[in-house]
Amino acid sequence: MAKTHEIKVERRADEGKGASRRLRHAGVIPAIVYGGELEPVSIQLNHEQIWLAQQNEWFYSSILDLNLNGDVQQVLLRDMQRHPFKQLIMHIDFQRVSANEKLSAAVPLHFINEASSPAGKSSEVVVTHELNEVQVVCLPKDLPEFIEVDLGALEVGNVIHLSEIKLPAGVEIPELKLGKEHDVAVVAAKHVRIEEDDAAGEEGSEGAETK
């Protein structure tokens, strides 16, 4: 069962640029909820509460419970506009989700056991994370906050592809249905040893220049 997080909201009475500007000056974020069989609803949220929430990974990848005076609607964050240089959220879009309809969402990847892997223990290997998130399709109840990628057995020269990620039950990666060329690398362990002869040659050149 996916975790949910409750956020209290209020209905927004006034709309337009002027009204939105006044809300922001009062520490309130203008927002909208759309999707499903209901009409779009203009809402407003406490800026301080959302500023703290958006610092957490779950805010972007989890089902959120919007509580409007006791009426709770399940939504996903679909867009968040920020001020270009101020610590200010300008506007938020939320999309309603239906318990019986699959949704598409970007889910973060958490890489574990890298340091203890054969590749991670080598000073001559660089482990690169080619992807930090993956687009999945699933029912709301199956949406994970993150997906773990276990690197414990990663060897020098190994590449882990998208198809090798262990997915939770009920979760699919639609990209993999588009063909083998879409089975991209997620992690690569590359050998980057510098030859001793090259290093010695560089030191000799530096010594000659200082004479």
Curated annotation (Swiss-Prot):
SUPFAM superfamilies: Ribosomal protein L25-like (SSF50715). The keyword 4Fe-4S does not apply. One of its GO terms (molecular function) is structural constituent of ribosome. It comes from the Bacteria. Keywords: Ribonucleoprotein, Ribosomal protein, RNA-binding, rRNA-binding. InterPro entries: Rbsml_bL25/Gln-tRNA_synth_N, Ribosomal_bL25/Gln-tRNA_synth, Ribosomal_bL25_b-dom, Ribosomal_bL25_C, Ribosomal_bL25_long, Ribosomal_bL25_short, Ribosomal_L25_dom, Ribosomal_uL5_bac-type. CDD domains: Ribosomal_L25_TL5_CTC. Gene3D superfamilies: Ribosomal protein L25, beta domain, Ribosomal Protein L25, Chain P. This is one of the proteins that binds to the 5S RNA in the ribosome where it forms part of the central protuberance. Part of the 50S ribosomal subunit; part of the 5S rRNA/L5/L18/L25 subcomplex. Contacts the 5S rRNA. Binds to the 5S rRNA independently of L5 and L18. HAMAP family: Ribosomal_bL25, Ribosomal_bL25_CTC. This is Large ribosomal subunit protein bL25. It comes from Xanthomonas euvesicatoria pv. vesicatoria (strain 85-10). The lineage of its organism: Bacteria, Pseudomonadati, Pseudomonadota, Gammaproteobacteria, Lysobacterales.
